Amino acid sequence: MNQRPLVIKLGGAVLSSIDTLTLLFKTISNYQQQAKRSLIIVHGGGYLVDELMAKLQLETIKKEGLRVTPKDQIGYITGALAGTANKMLQGQAMKNNVKAIGLSLADGGLCQITQLNPELGNVGLATAGDAKVLEAILATQVTPIISSIGITNDGELMNVNADQAAVAVATALDADLVLLSDVPGVLDAEKQLIKSLDSAQAEMLIHQAVITDGMIVKVRAALDAAQELGRAIEVASWRSPEKLAELFIGNSIGTQFQPQ
C-alpha cells in the first residue's frame, strides 16, 4: 500500500457547491478509514475573492491567470481565502466526519514565500520549507486544510496561486499531488481529454492557444511538480466525486503530467 501522503488541491467553483463538497469529504472519510493514508487539502477560492471585489467595487485584473494584488487589497483577499474559504471547507469536513485543522502556507514555516513580480503586487512564490509541524499534525490523523495565503520573512502577506502553493506543500512533504479543478483535465483542440502530457507537448499547445488563461498556470504548476517530485502529477475534475476514490488509490481519471 502506498503510504506517501497525498496533497489534494481544491479550486474553482467547488467551494460554492455544498453538494459536491459533501460527496468529496464523504469520499475522503471513507478512503481514510480504509487506507490510513495522510491527506492534505490545499485550496484557493478565487470566486469568493471575485465576489468580494465586486461588492467593494474594486477592479479585478489578471495577468496570465494570476490575480494582480495591490497592497491595499491583500487584507481583503487574506480574509476571503484564509478566513471564509478555509473555515467553510473545515466546516464541511467536520460535518462529514473528517477531523480537520485550518492552516496557511506560513504556519510552522511550511513554505518560504517571496514576492513573485513587483508588477503583480502582493503575489507570492512559494517554495518548500519546513514540514515538521505539518508532519506532527498528520501523525494525529487530522486532515490539514491549507489556504494559499503566505507570509514573507519581512512579514508581508502574499496571495499565492493555489496550484503553485500545492506544489510547494507536496514538495515539502515528498507527497503525491492531485490538482482538482472545474475541468476534467487538459483538453485538445477537439475538446477531448488528453490522458498524458509532457513539457514539450504542453508548450506546443500553449503556443497554439489550445491551452489558455488560467489553465496555463495550472499546466506549468503540474509540470513543475512532476519535475520536482520525479513522478506523474494528475489534473482532474472535482465534478465527479464518485471517481475520486479511484484517483486516491493511484488510478488516473484526468490528465497525467509526466516528468522529463
Curated annotation (Swiss-Prot):
This is Acetylglutamate kinase. The keyword Cytoplasm applies. One of its GO terms (biological process) is L-arginine biosynthetic process. It holds the Pfam family AA_kinase. It is found in: Cytoplasm. It comes from the Bacteria. It catalyses: N-acetyl-L-glutamate + ATP = N-acetyl-L-glutamyl 5-phosphate + ADP. Catalyzes the ATP-dependent phosphorylation of N-acetyl-L-glutamate. The record marks 9, 218 as: Transition state stabilizer. Keywords: Amino-acid biosynthesis, Arginine biosynthesis, ATP-binding, Cytoplasm, Kinase, Nucleotide-binding, Transferase. GO terms for molecular function: acetylglutamate kinase activity; ATP binding. Substrate binds at residues 45-46, 67, 159. Its EC number is 2.7.2.8. InterPro entries: AceGlu_kinase-like_sf (IPR036393), AcgluKinase_fam (IPR004662), ArgB (IPR037528), Asp/Glu/Uridylate_kinase (IPR001048). The gene is argB. The keyword Nucleotide-binding applies. Gene3D superfamilies: Acetylglutamate kinase-like. GO terms for cellular component: cytoplasm. Belongs to the acetylglutamate kinase family. ArgB subfamily. Pathway: Amino-acid biosynthesis; L-arginine biosynthesis; N(2)-acetyl-L-ornithine from L-glutamate: step 2/4.
